[in-house]
């Protein structure tokens, strides 16, 4: 399913009829402007695959299994090939100690293909094996509200799932000890990035539910100390603030999201101008 931006309508001189597109920008657009997707490296240590492989080797992992995983791990540029190698590995070695990592990394490959059904299936497979995988929790919880369809009969349940994922991700991060070999600064930076992603996702979940006050609270947390926030976060925050009749703040958010080259540049510019007029009339 290929997603595209829907157009937002603007009232002539009345209240702005701003809307987040019913579907978010296509994944190719999202990844150009988003700080969050895809999964980068396992929270807790770098090169998680190699670390787990070393542990598996100590347990006497079969050489063929090791080679199959290395082929999957080393495939960086071709998502179709990575999917093929990953699925072949899972079919042949379903009980492998490396299975969770394969599922987790298949999430990225399926995201590149905009194959949301298999993104969800791979994420669910990874979380069944490792419920505290922060990377998968944060990524799944972030993706769900971005590809949400208002007419999906399972939409409400999916938003509930996204909320649970992000809340659990933050719970895990709060109790996670700093791993050996990672500096305090590095660990703090990754935790901050994941926490920001979680608040971003929750902001969009609450927006989809039309709970604009809670959405604004989450997205304002995202903006704190953030010099280069995600443009979709800024857009949604602008709509939240508009709905809450905080017009000048809404205009500021729309101005910030009108970054050159952004998929939301034109919409944000138009909305900023319209809301400025509304702010002036409300004084």
Task: Walk through the language-model features, giving the residues of each.
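N-terminal leader/linker segments that initiate helical-solenoid repeat arrays
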Residues: 26-101
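Structural register within alpha-helical repeat arrays
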Residues: 68-71, 106, 140, 202, ...
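Short coil/turn linking the two alpha-helices of tandem helical-hairpin repeats
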Residues: 72-76, 110-114, 141-155, 210, ...
